[in-house]
Structure formats: C-alpha cells, structure tokens
C-alpha cells in the first residue's frame, strides 16, 4: 500500500481565466457534492484497510468483507470515497456527524477495541478508484471500478453551463452543490487541479460559533476546527484559519 496525498479540486471562483473561458461549453462528469469525510480504502496483498484522508487508520469488518469479495481478482488498489453516517445523510452540515464517529472508530482501532460504528448506517459514496502502478484517465478508472461492481456515485455528462443549473438544484435540496471532473483527466496526487471543480451554489448565511474541536497529530492541544450554527440550527465544522 502506497500512501499519497489526494488530488483536490478547485472552487469555481478560484479557477483561472483560461479555464473559465471555456467552462460553459466543456463537458464534465457531474455528481452530487456530499458533505462528509473523504476516506481511503486500500487493498494490499489481499488485506482491506480503511484510512482517513490524512492516513489515520480505522476498521469496519463487515464492510471490509464486502469490499474484499468485490475486489476478488484485482491487483493492489485504492478506493476513494466520501463517507457519511445515517440514512439520507450527506447534506450540508452532516460532516460533523460522521467526523465524530470516525474519530471514535480510530481511537478504538488504536486500542485494539471492536469497531464502534453501526456499519448498517455507513454510506460510502465512491468517486474514484486507482490501481497501484497505473495511470488511467477518469473514464477508464470508472470503467475498472464498475467491473468490480463497486457502489459508485451517480454521474451525468453535461456542459459547465448546465452543471451550474444542476448545482443550484442540488443546493436547494440541501446538498453542498456539485462536483465536476473532466472525463479524460488524469489523477494527480497531491495537486489542486483545474479540471476537478467544486460548484457550491448556496445562499450566504450568518453563522454563530458554538464550540471548538481539538486538533490532533501536530495540532494536539490546539484548536482544530470551529463549530458554527446557522439560523435554522444546522451545524457545520470549518477550519479555524489559525496558523501554526
């Protein structure tokens, strides 16, 4: 298993002028942007392991068995997914719910305790699949993932102009918006790329800070993130913006 920093997309308002010039007519694979936690699921010599986006390990035995069965015959690989917890989860504000669950699961794993998660409530929205030692474009990676019958996010092929309309619809339904990726693009580990785009079309709101979450790792004994609440009672977790 080879650890790596994930590829990151850019917010629409951070795109360079060159990308914006052709955005409306460029075709993208468009999916719902869920508000959850990105996780890695790796297969190494037949062993299935679960990791946070910064490579802290936890475990879900029943889900591991399902994935092991699905990936029978595959080489070593990495599944990248947005993890949510609870029926109909994944809407704006749901990230805080799953974050706490993953933290507890990580602590239990380090202590050798059983998995603390109700695995029936775990939702894995798989959006990428990388076979070790390969360099395939997005379309090719999705074809490979479908061969193993992995539960992928639903995608639709549409122009950037139509994706903006679609993202507004998703925002009205309570989601963050839409994720766009150029079908022929290649995965660049550790890079923030112009061909993976976050469309977050939602109204602005005044938020009140109701608490803080402690940092971990190099941020132990520091503020890790702020808990903010809007006028409807929805809670979101955001980075503090504080430097080291």
Located regions from the model:
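Amphipathic alpha-helical
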Residues: 1, 155-203
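Charged, flexible boundary elements
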Residues: 1-25, 30
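Short, motif-level signal for alpha-helix interfacial/capping segments enriched in acidic residues
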Residues: 12-18, 103-110, 158-164
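Covalent nucleotidyltransferase
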Residues: 20-151
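Classical nucleotidyltransferase
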Residues: 31, 37-81, 187-244
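Short helix-to-loop capping/linker segments positioned immediately adjacent to catalytic or ligand/cofactor-binding
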Residues: 113-116, 133, 154-170, 215-217
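A generic structural signal for well-ordered coil/turn residues at beta-strand boundaries
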Residues: 120-123, 174, 203, 222
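Short acidic/polar capping segments at secondary-structure boundaries
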Residues: 130-132, 184-185, 214-215
